């Protein structure tokens, strides 16, 4: 006679079967509907309130939630004038020893459509090829809400122990979460004391195992404007007399970045890499090898800055980087005349290591760029209003280490969990670490090879998402049954 599991312990096979079935019948259809809504984040759609797309996305997700057959589930949509809407839900625990709450976090706003979609695909029409679901906002981060609730429901369906759970799903993450402090102040009494934060809005090194994200970079930026003339001038007449605004701009950016290597110069943009993270990065590099750079759509003979996977992972997670993401004052090639242009303006985006103070770094960047302008030209750096600090995960408690390993082995054919630092930014994570200093953090996600979030052909790897959902369910069960601290 087989040994009976202790009371409240989830049966792994039943969890996997339930989650897989729910993905086919409930989750995937909801994510398809979400993709069809052009719920562009307010930073890219100043008229978002008039357009109503964010409200549509939030209302659709809330309507789905209200039909989920979970005992005691309560759903509310919070709104206030001028603020993005937010979904808050509560699910009572059952058979749990955990006194603290599990907090699920995610977002329903999206990056803009962008250019370059191929194969007849578009941002706002879902296409499923049997493995990947293409469309904007499916992987980043529309799947997270139904996946989180499905993980809880898998435990309820078999009477397994589950902790009290609350969910906060916002509509402004891609704009730096400007309204989240307000909503958390409103919700604090209802959230309660948090023992575990779950965020599914991050990445994975591959699709062969569960990946725990151990750090995120911060973000800041601004607009750099260089002006040399009031009006454009004949390039034959002015060239060699009037300095090129583009050349001046290059010199200014060289103050920040080594043009030969891409390394950033100011010390304020750097931090020490903890030895534990170096060791984990080496382990991830050994697992991934050439996949670290093979995940990108290289053109021609272009190659990565190095072929050392460990250095690339450290660059992405623990070192700063600079990108020019937009430009004004430069006409399209087809209409470019022989004119020495009066000005060049670019949008500068910086990603910063996890423990760097983003506001202080941005202030120093502005000082460096505006000091002693070449040729006395007009140089103005306008910093972005919203900055976001990075995040470094707290030390894992023994129960979480064991739960992660067991869940990965159960749901990924025996493969153990792996750990990785990610280069993206989730503004809320650092705030939650400060607000709940004793909480553990489960940051993971589906943004692995080929996901291409923010770019063309964004896609959700559905088989991985199903396994991630099952893994989350088993971890929640372990959290509910973990021994209370002495």
Feature-to-residue mapping (PLM):
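Active-site metal-coordination/substrate-binding segment of hydrolases
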Residues: 98-169, 467
